[in-house]
């Protein structure tokens, strides 16, 4: 690899904003906010909306969508149209 063309890859703490869980990993992302980790070192802190700790795929929790409302909206917009005087 060429020297000087790659971003700095360093340890970063990510925090799930909905659960508050934090995990230490490596990333090129940076932040002005910092946090002291359990090992006594200080790392940049990035707060994110969704992680494996809160994502429905990983937690098994389901989110119900208003599919009935979407179907009705679709039918109103694109539903049965009249062609040449016949319903079709």
Swiss-Prot record:
Pfam families: Ribosomal_L31
Protein keywords: Ribonucleoprotein, Ribosomal protein
Domain of life: Bacteria
GO cellular component: a single term: ribonucleoprotein complex
Molecular function, one GO term: structural constituent of ribosome
One GO term (biological process): translation
Protein family according to the UniProt entry: Belongs to the bacterial ribosomal protein bL31 family. Type B subfamily.
Database matches in HAMAP family: Ribosomal_bL31_2
Subunit comment: Part of the 50S ribosomal subunit.
Designated name of the protein: Large ribosomal subunit protein bL31B
Organism: Nocardia farcinica (strain IFM 10152)
Gene behind this protein: rpmE2
């Amino acid at each position: 690899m060429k020297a000087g063309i790659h971003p700095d890859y360093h340890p970063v703490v990510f925090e799930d904003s909905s659960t508050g869980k934090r995990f230490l990993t490596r990333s090129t992302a940076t932040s002005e906010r910092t946090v002291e980790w359990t090992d006594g070192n200080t790392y940049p802190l990035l707060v994110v909306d969704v992680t494996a700790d809160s994502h429905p795929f990983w937690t098994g929790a389901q989110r119900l969508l208003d599919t009935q409302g979407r179907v009705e909206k679709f039918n109103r917009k694109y539903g049965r149209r009249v062609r040449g005087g016949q319903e079709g």
